[in-house]
From Swiss-Prot:
InterPro entries for this protein: Bardet-Biedl_syndrome_7_prot, BBS7_GAE_dom, BBS7_hairpin, BBS7_pf_dom, Beta-prop_BBS7, WD40_repeat_dom_sf
Keyword set, alphabetical order: Acetylation, Cell membrane, Cell projection, Cilium, Cilium biogenesis/degradation, Cytoplasm, Cytoskeleton, Membrane, Protein transport, Transport
Protein's GO biological process: brain development; cilium assembly; eye development; fat cell differentiation; heart development; limb development; non-motile cilium assembly; positive regulation of proteasomal ubiquitin-dependent protein catabolic process
A Gene Ontology molecular function term of the record: RNA polymerase II-specific DNA-binding transcription factor binding
N-acetylmethionine found at: M1
Record's subunit section: Part of BBSome complex, that contains BBS1, BBS2, BBS4, BBS5, BBS7, BBS8/TTC8, BBS9 and BBIP10. Interacts with BBS2 (via C-terminus). Interacts with CCDC28B. Interacts with SMO; the interaction is indicative for the association of SMO with the BBsome complex to facilitate ciliary localization of SMO.
Cysteines engaged in disulfide bonds, as pairs: none
Main subcellular location of this protein, as a coarse class: membrane
Full protein name: BBSome complex member BBS7
Length: 715
């Protein structure tokens, strides 16, 4: 990495949504550009930068929340008309701020994504896609899952209109008119789409995608099939991708890839050998990066990466050096511009301090008045609750515009809180009376000063379902709190996948009865994550899932009056049977339940658990030895007398302890899964084997795979 960029904060607007900031084009190369940004207060602000200060060009009045901002204009001309999506309306402004368009789309849902190409307007709400030409309806498509972004391949290069939808079910849908031409499976839920090199590359068919689990890829969209070019995995476990741009920030004549993530990470990838991108620069900001674009804003001749963050900061990472070299014997003098900026900042700070003092006094006086009424200050929370495939844990991210004081986590189901490296908050646990009020967890995170983003990790137990609640209290007066609820589902560790291995030994659960397609779909939504709330189009639905903890799989096929569920894990079938029959009983629906149990599947599941259990037992054994080995080392003065295996444990002691600490109750969790498997195997035979559980735990304590399998067979 040989790119050095300096940070400059230009302006703070209201809270911003994804892709709501753009740079207006200029006629001269590397001349300063104007920035236009829309916020959730409905305000559009256009400004330039002179002598390091933001100078407004225009500012609109507040209105509905702005969900997208795009630039448009006639094809092959500078794209300098500003279009915003707010609610179900599209408004257009000139670069001077004059409104020239107000188009009410009459969509029943608010617009979530927008793309403009010449006179073509592509919009998507949660599930609905619409294509307009000159504000006249052209095409329409109803998606089976939520649409996160929409784009169109460049018409000027391909002479055809090819829209692409990024859908939550890990699929890119390539459209032709109102029909799907073909679907492209991607490794995670796609959150953002962008044209490769800003124009689709040489062919015009290059499409970049970013996913919510932090992966990045390039696909060539041909007329007949997709061609996967490359994909960058998220090995460093960074945040999900919110924005992507192409710009030559390295100055080598080849456009680089600029990436903004929801954990505040900004990355620059360059194409050294023109094949796969190489990371050349990264910098961590303290909050989500909602928009990113390369250009020139601060000073003529100096390229920079311009960002908008969740709390509304418009920031530049510029190539302009902050320090100027001085010759030998010369003193480095601050230029007049820098001195002016410092004095301006000082006076601004003094003014703000005086204003804060004044407002505090006013508040103090009014709060003591008998007539005064206190109003609760409103604040928005940007939250995300997602399942991580790598470690089978849920990541809960809470982001507030102002500093967070504390977050109280309450759960009515047993969950484990895992360590997060980025989390500097101090956590304290309160004892829970689980019998009286179903409280299994009460934990308070007290945040350090100026923390606006908090990330937590939890691991749930399948079969135990309920609600996790987060009470978020920011540092504002009067003290106020917002509650966010997250559902822990019965099969919470299952994740959607595109295909499963049909050769595995499968157990089958079949439900029949007088229930509608919508009813059985609502039961599947209740049991499993990542299932769209609306029933899919057609008479039958098929979903595939993989258990992120054990790698077992589940197939759900259902229609009106029938549901068939297949899994290589008996415990999954047992959980589904219990939960679905309970849900049907609530609605007074008679269910006919039948099942086919494959005995081979039990041995198969135990073999899947084996490497994980063996690894955890070995890790626990090594951690237990560390203190004794350290004592021996101190006593003997060296480690030469130890075997290579013990020396290795001492060398890796910190790493082993850290890993063990990160996975609390991991071993107990595996023991629990084997115990459930044992009980469930015999439950389907009508036998209660709970009295044999202590014997099973004894076998697990002196674990041997063959002995365990024999015990399962003999019981």
């Amino acid at each position: 990495m040989d790119l050095t960029l300096s940070r400059a904060d230009y302006l703070q607007v209201g809270v911003t949504s994804q892709k709501t900031m753009k740079l207006l084009p200029t006629s001269r190369q590397r001349a300063t550009q104007k920035v236009v940004v829309g916020d959730q207060d409905g305000v559009v602000i256009c400004f330039g930068v002179k002598k390091g200060e933001a100078v407004p060009v225009f500012k609109t009045l507040p209105g509905q929340k702005i969900s997208r901002l795009e630039l448009g204009g006639a094809v092959n001309t500078p794209q300098e008309k500003i279009f915003i999506a707010a609610g179900s309306e599209i408004r257009g402004f000139t670069k001077r701020g004059k409104q020239f368009l107000s188009f009410e789309t009459n969509l029943t849902e608010s617009i979530k994504a927008m793309y403009i190409s010449g006179s073509d307007l592509f919009l998507s709400a949660s599930y609905i896609y619409n294509h307009y030409c000159d504000c006249k309806d052209q095409n329409y498509y109803l998606s089976g899952d939520k649409i996160n972004d929409v784009i169109c391949l460049p018409v000027e290069k391909l002479s055809r209109v090819t829209p692409v939808l990024a859908c939550q079910d890990r699929v890119l849908r390539v459209l032709q008119g109102s029909d799907v031409m073909y679907e492209i499976e991607v490794p995670g839920p796609p959150t953002v789409l962008a044209l490769h090199n800003g124009d689709g590359g040489d062919s015009g068919e290059g499409l970049l995608f970013g996913t919510s689990d932090g992966r990045l890829g390039l696909i060539q969209i041909t007329t007949s099939k997709p061609i996967h070019k490359w994909e960058i995995r998220n090995d460093k476990k960074r945040g999900g991708i919110l924005c992507v741009d192409s710009f030559d920030i390295m100055g080598d004549g080849v456009k680089d890839l600029l990436v903004g993530r929801d954990d505040g990470m900004v990355e620059v990838y360059s194409f050294e050998n023109a094949n796969e991108p190489v990371l050349r620069f990264d910098q961590m900001l303290s909050e989500s990066v909602t928009s990113i674009q390369g250009g020139c804003v601060g000073k003529d001749g100096y390229d920079e990466i311009v960002l908008a963050t969740y709390s509304g900061w418009v920031t530049g990472l510029t190539t302009e050096p902050t320090h100027k070299e001085s010759g030998p014997g010369e003193e480095l003098k601050l230029n007049q511009e820098m001195q002016n900026k410092i004095s301006s900042l000082r006076s601004e700070i003094e003014h703000l301090q005086f204003k804060v003092l004044q407002e505090r006094e006013n508040y103090q006086q009014s709060s003591q008045s008998s007539q005064a009424k206190s109003t609760v200050p409103s604040f928005s929370i940007n939250d995300k609750f997602t399942l991580n495939k790598e470690d089978a844990s849920y990541s809960l991210v809470l982001e507030v515009r102002t500093a967070i004081d504390n977050v109280l986590i309450q759960s009515d189901v047993p969950i484990d809180l895992l360590d997060v490296d980025k989390n500097s908050a101090v956590v304290s646990f309160s004892s829970c009376d689980t019998e009286s009020n179903d409280n299994f967890l009460l934990a308070t995170y007290r945040c350090q000063a100026n923390t606006t983003r908090l990330e937590l990790k939890i691991r749930s137990i399948e079969g135990q379902y309920g609600t996790l609640q987060a009470y978020v209290t920011p540092r504002i007066q009067p003290k106020t709190c917002q509650v966010r609820q997250y559902h822990i589902k019965p099969l919470s560790l299952h994740q959607r996948t595109h295909f499963i291995d049909h050769d595995r030994p499968m157990n089958t659960l079949t439900l029949t009865g007088q229930f509608s397609f919508a009813e059985v779909h609502s039961w599947v939504v209740f049991c499993l994550p990542e299932v769209p709330e609306k029933p899919p189009a057609g008479e039958c639905a098929t979903f595939y899932f993989q258990n992120t903890f054990l790698d077992t799989q589940l197939e759900c096929v259902y229609r009106k009056g029938e549901g068939v569920f297949k899994s290589d894990n008996i415990s999954t079938i047992s959980i589904l049977k219990d939960v679905l029959s309970k849900e049907a009983t609530k609605r007074k629906i008679n269910l006919n339940i039948s099942y086919e149990i494959n005995e081979v599947s039990v041995k198969h599941t135990l073999k899947l658990i084996h490497p994980k259990l063996e690894y955890q037992l070995l890790l626990a054994k090594k951690v237990q030895l560390i203190d004794a080995l350290k004592e021996l080392q101190v006593h003997e003065g060296n480690t030469d007398f130890l075997t290579p295996e013990y020396r290795c444990i001492l060398e890796e002691a910190d790493h082993l302890q850290e890993e063990y600490k990160k996975q609390p109750a991991h071993l107990e969790r595996l023991y629990g899964m084997i115990t459930d498997l044992f009980i469930d195997k015999f439950k389907f035979k009508g036998t209660n084997v709970k009295t044999k559980v202590p014997m099973l735990l004894e076998i697990l304590d002196s674990y041997d795979q063959n002995t365990l399998i024999s015990f399962f067979d003999a019981a």
